[in-house]
């Protein structure tokens, strides 16, 4: 199992949690972004900078991910693609996306996108709560313990 992090929009506190888990377990972890993501110098923790552009980082993750890998992302279409390749997807808020839940999440995302396109203000996501941080860390630990 490898960890792939969609680091373009990953909150710093979640990146720190991922780094601690990778250090503790020794799992191979790569942060993929279109900007420099500072990571500690460890043999198993890497940063991969891709060119700026729409979905470039996402496409690179999809290209490299393998079955049973774990992708950390809050990007619903990316989660759908990696799940279809046999990988797992976990949001930075601690939601584990599955084959059973991802289609409903895509439908909600598309509906909200349609509303925004028609001029309706939908607002952004709430700030990451302490409960969501804990939920993320707990899910990550459970997944890594099963590998």
Curated annotation (Swiss-Prot):
Which InterPro entries does this one have? UPF0178
A Pfam family recorded for this sequence: DUF188
What domain of life does the UniProt record list for this protein's source? Bacteria
Q: Which family is annotated?
A: Belongs to the UPF0178 family.
Q: Mind telling me what this protein is named?
A: UPF0178 protein VIBHAR_03247
Q: Which organism is it from?
A: Vibrio campbellii (strain ATCC BAA-1116)
């Amino acid at each position: 199992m490898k960890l792939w992090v969609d680091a373009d929009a990953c909150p710093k506190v979640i990146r720190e949690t991922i780094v601690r888990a990778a250090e503790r377990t020794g799992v191979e972890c790569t942060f993929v972004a279109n900007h420099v993501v500072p990571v500690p110098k460890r043999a198993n923790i890497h940063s991969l900078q891709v060119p700026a552009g729409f979905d470039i980082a996402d496409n690179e993750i999809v290209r490299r991910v393998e079955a049973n890998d774990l992708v950390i992302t809050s990007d619903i279409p990316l989660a759908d693609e990696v799940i279809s390749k046999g990988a797992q997807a976990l949001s930075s808020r601690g939601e584990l996306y599955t084959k059973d839940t991802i289609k409903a999440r895509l439908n909600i995302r598309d509906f909200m996108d349609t509303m925004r396109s028609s001029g309706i203000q939908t607002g952004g996501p709430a700030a990451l709560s302490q409960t969501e941080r804990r939920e993320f860390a707990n899910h990550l630990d459970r997944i890594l313990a099963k590998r």
